[in-house]
A protein has these predicted regions:
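All-alpha RGS (Regulator of G-protein Signaling) helical domain and cognate RGS-like helical scaffolds
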Residues: 1-141
Length: 141
C-alpha cells in the first residue's frame, strides 16, 4: 500500500499541475467535483506522510516513490484513471489487512481504506454510476 499511496499522490500532484478548474468546466464537470478531487489529492498526500512517519518510527527505511508514466492526456482520462486508482486503493488496503499484526496500525489502515472507499464512491457518483455498486469490496493481494 505504500507504493500505491506514492502512486496516487504523484498522480494527483502531476494532474493538478496540468489541469485547472476551467479545464473541468469545459468538459461538463462542475466546480464541486473539481474541489472534491483536490480534497482527494490532499488526502493522498496525508496518507503518504503518515505512512512514511509510521515506517520511520518503526526503524525501517520507507520505500521511495517510483517514476510513473500515467496515461492521462485530458480531463476525461484523468478522471477515468483516478477512479480506477481509488478503487484499487480500497481493495489493496483490504488485501493487506491480514498481514498487519499491530492493532494500532490495522486501525489506521482501516481508516485509510474507508477514506479510499469514499473517494471511489464520490468519483463513481460524479460519473453517473452507482457510488457503491456491490455490498463487498473485492480484495487485492
Amino acid at each position: 500500500v505504500r507504493q500505491l499511496e506514492h502512486l496516487e499522490n504523484t498522480f494527483y500532484r502531476e494532474a493538478f499541475t496540468s489541469f485547472q478548474l476551467q479545464d473541468f468546466l469545459n468538459v461538463g464537470f462542475d466546480e464541486e467535483f473539481f474541489l472534491n478531487l483536490q480534497f482527494i489529492a490532499a488526502d493522498e498526500s496525508a496518507h503518504v506522510d503518515f505512512l512514511i512517519a509510521a515506517i520511520q518510527s518503526a526503524g525501517v527505511a520507507p520505500v521511495q516513490p517510483c517514476q510513473y508514466n500515467f496515461p492521462v492526456t485530458d480531463v476525461a482520462s484523468f478522471v477515468t484513471v483516478s477512479a480506477i486508482l481509488e478503487s484499487i486503493g480500497t481493495s489493496a488496503y483490504l488485501g493487506a489487512a491480514p498481514f498487519i499484526s499491530s492493532r494500532e496500525i490495522l486501525t489506521v489502515a482501516a481508516s485509510i481504506m474507508a477514506t479510499e472507499g469514499l473517494h471511489t464512491s464520490l468519483q463513481r457518483s460524479s460519473l453517473g454510476a452507482i457510488g457503491a455498486p456491490n455490498p463487498f469490496v473485492t480484495v487485492s493481494t
